[in-house]
Amino acid sequence: MAVPTTRKDLMIVNMGPHHPSMHGVLRLIVTLDGEDVIDCEPIVGYLHRGMEKIAENRTIIQYLPYVTRWDYLATMFTEAITVNGPEQLGNIQVPKRASYIRVIMLELSRIASHLLWLGPFMADIGAQTPFFYILRERELIYDLFEAATGMRMMHNYFRIGGVAADLPYGWIDKCLDFCDYFLIGLTEYQKLITRNPIFLERVENVGIIGGEEAINWGLSGPMLRASGIQWDLRKVDHYECYDEFDWEVQWQKEGDSLARYLIRIGEMAESVKIIQQALEGIPGGPYENLEIRRFNRIKYPEWNDFEYRFISKKPSPAFELSKQELYVRVEAPKGELGIFLIGDQSVFPWRWKIRPPGFINLQILPQLVKKMKLADIMTILGSIDIIMGEVDR
């Protein structure tokens, strides 16, 4: 009878691109020595769609419905960054009411994104129950989005100079009711998760990043603030009307997966504070700067013909991008979402470079998982919070 021999060589394991814990089509080539991770190589690009090149062959109005496919769980932020660039290039003023509506929608989108991070993150480390609680609250946010924009996801709500439509009758009261209800739900999550000994065993002192290390890697968002760096673009860049509200930047100094969890929980509570203040203080006035609608004002007689009205293509309003370059950024749920925009006196951008937070934050994954256990890969990857739509673009 043959005696089984023990192999001592390293083992290479492919995780993904179809693994449920990969949060999209991410592939990890993991080198293992037993349960210990020796090396990890992320392979990205499976969801690449050429979004930057598409932007350079479209007007901003034509491109706007497509940008929601970058980070498809926080679509308001991709719309915000797409209209902020042309607004700054053209010195277009946004009415105060429109700015308040934008802030409300952005913070609701931040809560929805953090909720859909928290549910799968808990499922990855073995806790299924919170996932169902979290979807309950997230559906309420999507109900609010549907009432205001007509769409539960991929809203196409932001416009250059404002938003597409004003808030419907009764929406503000409905949103205030949601805020009160959600704060109770958030307390439930914390009771269920934060002091759970099994949860703490999986996340405490796992995936530690120091402050200087986080800056050197170019990390942003909760990944940066969990390492003791108090950097939030809503406070730093003073965009929209965030300065008019009373709220605190959430940060921790431990730098581990638990710190990143605590920051996102804290950010949801702060987002509710911002939304409540904005709803109670929202001013009257227009929801869009109508003066910047530049339609072709020449009227042609064939415009009333049957063929034109029902068959021909109508030109969309075009905004000429002045000949200069500009970098604009917003504080998205996953970090700094930026656009480097170059105009050349054309309605098309000459260059449209996307700076996705998930792609930059993912760079540090191989360093974090080395010398850890195989099971810790799921914890660390989940705490980074990536969406492959924005990683691959």
Curated annotation (Swiss-Prot):
Listed GO CC annotations: chloroplast thylakoid membrane
KW Lipid biosynthesis (keyword) present: no
Repeat among keywords: no
GO biological process: photosynthesis, light reaction
Location in or out of the cell: Plastid, Chloroplast thylakoid membrane
Catalytic activity: a plastoquinone + NADH + (n+1) H(+)(in) = a plastoquinol + NAD(+) + n H(+)(out); a plastoquinone + NADPH + (n+1) H(+)(in) = a plastoquinol + NADP(+) + n H(+)(out)
Signal sequence range: none
Regions that span the bilayer: none
EC numbers, comma separated: 7.1.1.-
Enzyme class: translocase
Cross-referenced Pfam families: Complex1_49kDa
Keyword terms: Chloroplast, Membrane, NAD, NADP, Plastid, Plastoquinone, Quinone, Thylakoid, Translocase, Transport
InterPro entries: NADH_Q_OxRdtase_suD, NADH_UbQ_OxRdtase_49kDa_CS, NDH1_su_D/H, NiFe-Hase_large
Role according to the record: NDH shuttles electrons from NAD(P)H:plastoquinone, via FMN and iron-sulfur (Fe-S) centers, to quinones in the photosynthetic chain and possibly in a chloroplast respiratory chain. The immediate electron acceptor for the enzyme in this species is believed to be plastoquinone. Couples the redox reaction to proton translocation, and thus conserves the redox energy in a proton gradient.
Database matches in NCBIfam families: PRK06075.1, PRK07415.1
Family: Belongs to the complex I 49 kDa subunit family.
UniProt-recorded name of the protein: NAD(P)H-quinone oxidoreductase subunit H, chloroplastic
Gene transcribed to yield this protein: ndhH
